[in-house]
Amino acid sequence: MEDKKDALISKTISMLLDNGFAVADISGQFSASFDIIARRNIERYVLKVLYNIDTLKPTTAYQLAKVAKFLRSTATIVGEKAGGGPLEDGVIYYRHGIPISSLDTFRDYINGEKPYIYSGPGGFYVKINGEALREMRMKMSLSIGYLSHYLGVSRRSVSLYENGSSATIDVFLKLQEIIKSDLVDHTDLFKIIPDNFQEEERVDDVYIQMLLDILERIGLDTKPAYRMPFDILARDEEVVSLIASLLSEEADKTKIEIMKKISSVLEDDAFLISKHSTTRENINGCPVINIVDLEKMTSKDELLRMLEKRAR
């Protein structure tokens, strides 16, 4: 299974590079909730690759969604199979609120072909543009009763479609037969946001909690990071996104290299925080700030200025 997953990761990275993305590959280097960070101009993705999408755990999904939110990116999973069969191309699947697709579907998506079919209980569905349906039905002088009979559904179902509910593929195709117009609600199925972001997370490390409190005080929204190559996620309401890690006694070079990779791809700041006084201002291109200096700061701008200075 791991060999198949590794092969899919390699294919995904090659596809992203071929399509003009800058890529940070952290798969195999760290047991993280994501495998790939990618950016192309303003498009930013945090990707997890799974051979079988049914192996996704709720905790992994939450961490993936959280890091994507804080890095102003889209969380998505590239997979190959669900249950006993392959993922259908052109279809979006969801597990624990995270959008999932085949590699070919994701390739089409980043090249402008947005899928409009999604997998749900009992089959595949299309979200209907209710306003367009109502407008065309009235323009064609079709009653709700006539349309329900033609479609083989209840009058209530037609009313629900006109209020933006989804229809099965079979019903949608029948709708298209009689109403030859675009009836798809073109909501980006990759941009649907999970609703569990406010989940409370216990922080056992007193230093991590202290850092979260300091960053909150200077104007940043923060979250602890678990199963990631950093300890803290932070952002403001505008454009700032940060990742930070508590510096251990012996600097973890692999961890620092991964943070630097992510920082470089997304063009966001990554920095290390020392518990003790240190003369080091930079490790392998990653700025270092000691916790005492951080405590003295009164604004996020002060932090950003120091990061810019020490990143040189």
UniProtKB/Swiss-Prot annotation:
- Entry's SMART domains? HTH_XRE
This protein is called what?
Putative HTH-type transcriptional regulatory protein Ta1363
Q: Note the DNA-binding span(s) on this chain.
A: 144-163
The record, for SUPFAM superfamilies, names:
lambda repressor-like DNA-binding domains (SSF47413)
Q: Read off the InterPro entries from this record.
A: Arc_TR_HTH, Cro/C1-type_HTH, Lambda_DNA-bd_dom_sf
Q: Which GO terms describe its molecular function?
A: DNA binding; DNA-binding transcription factor activity
What organism does the record attribute this protein to?
Answer: Thermoplasma acidophilum (strain ATCC 25905 / DSM 1728 / JCM 9062 / NBRC 15155 / AMRC-C165)
Pfam families registered for this protein in UniProt: HTH_3 (PF01381)
